Design a protein with these regions (language model features):
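N-terminal active-site segment of His-dependent metallophosphoesterases
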Residues: 1-68, 75-76
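Short, charged helix-to-loop "capping" segments that act as catalytic/coupling loops
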Residues: 70-79, 113-114
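His/Asp/Glu-rich metal-coordinating catalytic cores
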Residues: 87-161
Length: 161
């Protein structure tokens, strides 16, 4: 499978009072152009979509426009998105149910207990099915609440649990 992998978009970021809106819109437009040209099997956005956990309306609009342009491409390209440490898991997860029906799969929130599972997305190529388990950003303290007080020593140990 071929992917376009993006991370750390930090949409809405300002650099020393300089608004990066035009730069961000330009580079996201370039991504749309590359997706149109390369026709990947999926686009993976691995966290830090926004620069702040409560993004500005402008930042949300930029990301909305980006997803709208990507979702209009033919053939359709599935989009897999996970939240990062700068994102609000709940805000990023908003409308994920209906977006998933349109091929935009978002995992903002983590499972709240051991009975819940990570969001699984199954894609297919000429070799068969491929399963993706969307694991959003997690803090070691999260593991303690789900695994009855167990406390991992590091982020990597938390993910392994």
């Amino acid at each position: 499978m071929r992917f376009i992998h993006l991370s750390d978009l930090h949409i809405g970021r300002q650099l020393h009072q300089y608004n990066l809106k035009e730069d961000q819109e330009h580079i996201l437009g370039e991504v749309v152009d590359y997706a149109r040209m390369l026709k990947p099997d999926a686009i993976v956005i691995a966290g830090d979509v926004y620069d702040k956990s409560v993004p500005s309306a402008e930042a949300v609009g930029i990301f909305d426009c980006f997803l709208t342009e990507l979702s209009a491409l033919k053939p359709e390209i599935p989009i897999l998105i996970i939240s990062g440490n700068h994102d609000s898991a709940q805000r990023l997860d908003y409308a994920s149910g209906i977006l998933g029906q349109k091929g935009i799969y978002i995992a903002g929130k983590l499972p709240q207990n051991q009975e819940e599972f990570l969001k699984k997305v199954t894609l297919q190529d000429e070799y068969g099915e491929v399963d993706f388990y969307l694991l959003p950003f997690l803090k070691p303290g999260y593991v303690r609440t789900v695994f009855d007080g167990e406390m991992p020593e590091s982020y990597s140990k938390a993910v392994q649990m």
